[in-house]
A protein has these predicted regions:
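Membrane-proximal helix-turn-helix segments that form the acceptor-binding/catalytic region
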Residues: 61, 80-97, 111
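Short alpha-helical donor nucleotide-sugar binding micro-motif in glycosyltransferases
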Residues: 204-205, 212-217
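Carbohydrate-associated surface elements
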Residues: 103, 122
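Conserved acidic donor-binding segment of nucleotide-sugar-dependent glycosyltransferases
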Residues: 258-259, 263-270, 279-284
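C-terminal alpha-helical cap of glycosyltransferases
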Residues: 303-330
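Nucleotide-activated donor-binding/catalytic signature segment of Leloir-type glycosyltransferases, i.e.
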Residues: 187-208
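Short hydrophobic beta-strand element within catalytic cores of glycosyltransferases
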Residues: 243-246
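Conserved donor-binding/catalytic core segment of Leloir-type glycosyltransferases
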Residues: 136-164, 176
């Protein structure tokens, strides 16, 4: 890991991205490129920071193959601030462009027309599948897990409202909320007025403990309201063999299918969410079936498989010079 400036919090797509905006990093980056002579430079969101733009505009005698990956879906201000003409000037420096999903491809294509290869995100399946649950949550209660940053677009307030109703009918349930940030005013109001009980606010946790929370869950709920081009958190739940309840937003529908790996509810609809939760709380066999289906599907998202797709794409983009290898990738 080579530090490239102090990250600055920047609003992006309903979230906060931490990127380096220091133009003074360019000489350092160019010296690094010149010294290492990378065969491939792979940039994620290539126009989003001074670091990626500096790497994008660098070249030396035998120009390295430059690849950009786009994760953004609706909500990013970057593509509204700059015209397609300006963005195209920089995108033309890329030899290949990747989108992590069809929604991400559609979004970036609307701003920068071109050919995009869809290669999804991947995860380390093994570390989730082998994680051990926390003993304190193995007390017979049905554990419902929310995991994500406490941002409005993640939709936690809808889950809290649904759980508040559910808890009266099914007192042997527990809601575990994992993620950094602060609850919004509506979420605080729901907890204060309804006092549903058995709500665990775990805060931010380590990667190791995150796997254990998934292993402790009977149901994973992803109530996001939009601005998601993919759903890595769904992959993590599937790797943990956990039944999923997810909102029917476009990004999630690329990862799971209704009735196969997940029950999908109408986004922002508390009643629809509650009905899906009730089905799973009532039906252990259905939870098992969804969990097993998810565990099978997630195999295609193993990093080993995704990395193979990336290497194949790098090779396609390589020049006709057969002596040019792929030993050095940034």
């Amino acid at each position: 890991f080579i530090p490239m400036g102090r990250p600055v919090p920047v609003p992006s797509g309903g979230s906060i991205a931490r990127v380096s905006l220091s133009v003074w990093m360019r000489p350092k980056i160019w010296r690094l490129m010149e010294h290492e002579k990378f065969d491939v430079i792979h940039l994620h969101e290539p126009f989003a920071s001074a670091v990626t733009l500096s790497a994008l505009t660098f070249n030396y005698g035998d120009i390295p193959t430059k690849v950009g990956t786009y994760h953004t879906f609706n909500g990013s201000h970057l593509y509204k601030l700059f015209s397609s003409r300006i963005l195209r000037r920089y995108s033309d420096l890329l030899h290949g462009q990747i989108a992590v999903s069809e929604p991400a491809r559609a979004f970036i294509s609307a701003h920068i027309p071109g050919d995009y290869k869809v290669i999804p995100n991947g995860i380390d399946v093994k570390k989730f599948s082998e994680a051990s649950p926390f003993p304190r949550f193995s007390d017979g209660k049905t554990n419902i897990l929310f995991l994500g940053r406490l941002e409005k677009r993640k939709g936690l307030k809808y889950l809290l409202a649904a759980y508040s109703d559910l808890k009266w009918e099914f007192p042997n349930t527990r809601l575990i909320v994992v993620g950094g940030g602060n609850l919004d005013a509506e979420s605080m109001r729901i907890l204060g007025e309804r006092s549903p009980g058995d709500v665990i606010l775990a805060g931010a946790v380590s990667e190791f403990d995150k796997c254990r929370y998934f292993a402790s869950a009977d149901i994973f709920c992803a109530p996001a309201t939009g601005q998601e081009s993919f759903g890595i958190v769904l992959l993590e739940a599937m790797a943990s063999r956990t039944a999923i309840v997810a909102s029917d937003i476009v990004g999630f529908s690329q990862v799971v299918h209704e009735g196969r790996e997940a029950l999908m509810f109408k986004s922002r609809n508390v009643q629809s969410l509650k009905e899906s939760l009730v089905r799973l709380v009532n039906d252990k066999a259905l939870r098992s079936r969804l969990g097993n289906s998810g565990r099978t599907r997630v195999e295609q998202y193993r990093w080993e498989n995704i990395a193979a797709q990336l290497i194949d794409y790098y090779r396609i983009l390589q020049t006709a010079d057969s002596s040019k290898g792929l030993a050095n990738v940034l």
